[in-house]
């Protein structure tokens, strides 16, 4: 650690600062908030258009949240409190939600029943599927309209499908030509076939509509939405990582409470060498911890030990580093290696995002700020006439308790995988609820808008400039009190402020 206080014994000499301890200094600026570049890296090879990730928590990020995050320019990290099969399915749902071209379209056999075809459409939230033979040759297409008025769900698909010849395109068709075919023939789906008539891809009107509706969406090289996923540090994690990579996940986060641990570091190296996607390591809170992750070969460093609103690590274990100092320290190691830093936890207001970036983070991960969104998987609750959504830490008793066939996918994050009985678990988190906040797009609009304002005040035209130009002033408790609205009874809540 670097920040020592004169006259204090070395063992106690490190000063730790968090978001409420500092403010950013306003600087000379020619930067307009609406003109700043807020794109950034989350790992060596993955970029996002806004520097925000949704946390890998079971009350924050599943496929619906991940889709919404990517459409707004960020990215969601799917939690791992799921079976491998279920987590892979979540990745598949995100990747199939929209794309420039579906390279591996869902298909159905002509002998399948309408009930089976309908279930397939419902599972993947699609309105129809191509019909192919075992060799992959396109035979026709069946859509919701074909099935809508069929009361006998045991009928075969071949009896109601629209058979060949269909309007099709060749592999490699341009987006302009594909759109022209869709428009001219008034169809919603354009199958792509090779010279032998074998189905090779699918383009839909929906993808063009979504591209216009969400121009800032974060996408991969194939035009699919970006998505990440969390894995653990164990033999099961290696199998999980390989399955997720095979499903098309863009990056993995090795998700542990203490990344500066030899076992965790060993598994990070094994996972990195076995998959062809970027691997982010975490969590750490010191320069040495970040360096250990980098030495293990990770492509990104996730910082935060105990800052989250639902985390009790700092009081149960007495461990942690205030988040601004933790980010600054980790960035000292990461910058030299060209590895991005993710600030994970402790953010309460949009202004905290700018503070994290100025301290050295490239992006930030959000939990409680997004847990109240419509797209989060938490249960919607009504309490005294007000709406809330359930939220809990992944170290809470509820998250770590056995699931399904006596299996927990969360407790190994806190190195308690071998605890056989739930009543012997030592939780490092709590369960509760947060106010319902409506659609994610509205919440992100306020968070991103606040960040743009921060950058305008600092005079930073990009995320990189936030770190180089951002300067802090440490404040007292009186300074913090002055920073919030005071000496007034607030009668109307602003969409981006409430007193915590």
What does each model-identified segment do?
Residues 64-67, 239-244, 285-303, 343, ...:
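Catalytic cores of alpha/beta
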Residues 80-95, 131, 135-151, 182, ...:
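Terminal amphipathic helices with adjacent charged low-complexity linkers/tails
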Residues 34, 84-92, 150-154, 174, ...:
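Active-site-adjacent beta->alpha loops and helix N-cap segments on the catalytic face
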Residues 1-28, 108-109, 169-170, 230, ...:
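Alpha/beta catalytic cores of nucleotide-metabolism and tRNA/nucleoside-modifying enzymes
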Residues 78-81, 107-108, 128-130, 168-170, ...:
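Catalytic beta/alpha-barrel core
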């Amino acid at each position: 650690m670097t920040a020592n206080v004169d006259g204090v014994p070395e063992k106690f000499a490190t000063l730790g600062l968090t978001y409420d301890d500092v403010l950013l200094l306003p600087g000379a600026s020619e930067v307009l908030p609406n003109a700043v570049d807020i794109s950034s890296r989350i790992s060596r090879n993955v970029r996002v258009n806004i520097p925000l990730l949704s946390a890998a928590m079971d009350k924050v990020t599943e496929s619906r949240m991940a889709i919404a995050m990517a459409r707004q320019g960020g990215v969601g990290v799917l939690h791992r409190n799921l079976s491998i099969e279920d987590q892979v399915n979540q990745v598949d749902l995100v990747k199939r939600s929209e794309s420039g071209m579906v390279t591996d379209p869902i298909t159905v056999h002509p002998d399948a029943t309408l009930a089976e075809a309908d279930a397939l459409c419902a599972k993947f939230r699609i309105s129809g599927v191509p019909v192919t033979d075992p060799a992959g040759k396109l035979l026709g297409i069946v859509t919701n309209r074909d099935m809508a008025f069929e009361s006998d769900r045991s009928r075969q698909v071949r009896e109601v499908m629209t058979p060949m010849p269909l309007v099709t395109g060749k592999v490699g068709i341009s987006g302009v030509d594909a759109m022209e075919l869709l428009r001219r023939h008034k169809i919603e789906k354009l199958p792509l076939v090779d010279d032998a008539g074998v189905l090779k891809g699918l383009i839909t009107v929906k993808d063009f509509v979504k591209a216009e509706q969400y121009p800032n969406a974060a996408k991969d090289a194939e035009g699919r939405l970006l998505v990440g996923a969390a894995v653990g540090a164990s033999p099961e994690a290696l199998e999980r990582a390989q399955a997720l990579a095979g499903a098309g996940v863009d990056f993995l986060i090795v998700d542990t409470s203490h990344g500066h641990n030899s076992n965790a570091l060993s598994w990070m190296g094994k996972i990195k060498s076995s998959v062809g996607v970027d691997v982010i390591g975490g969590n750490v809170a010191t320069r040495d911890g970040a360096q250990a992750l980098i030495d293990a070969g990770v492509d990104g460093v996730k910082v935060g030990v105990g800052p989250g609103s639902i985390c009790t690590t700092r009081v149960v274990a007495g461990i942690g580093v205030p988040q601004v100092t933790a980010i600054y320290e980790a960035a000292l190691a990461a910058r030299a290696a060209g590895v991005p830093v993710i600030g994970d936890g402790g953010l309460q207001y949009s202004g905290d995002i700018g503070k994290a970036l100025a301290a050295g983070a490239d992006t930030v991960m959000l939990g409680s700020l997004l847990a109240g969104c419509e797209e989060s998987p938490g249960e919607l609750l009504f309490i005294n006439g007000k709406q809330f959504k359930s939220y809990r830490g992944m170290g809470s008793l509820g998250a770590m308790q056995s699931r399904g066939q006596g299996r927990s996918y969360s407790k190994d994050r806190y190195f308690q995988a071998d605890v056989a009985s739930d009543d012997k678990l030592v939780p490092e988190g709590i369960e509760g609820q947060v106010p319902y906040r409506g659609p994610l797009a509205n919440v992100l609009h306020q968070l991103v808008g606040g960040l743009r304002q921060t950058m305008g005040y600092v005079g930073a035209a990009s995320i990189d400039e936030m770190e180089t130009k951002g300067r802090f002033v440490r404040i007292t408790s009186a300074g913090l009190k002055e920073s919030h609205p005071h000496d007034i009874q607030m009668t109307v809540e602003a969409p981006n402020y409430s007193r915590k």
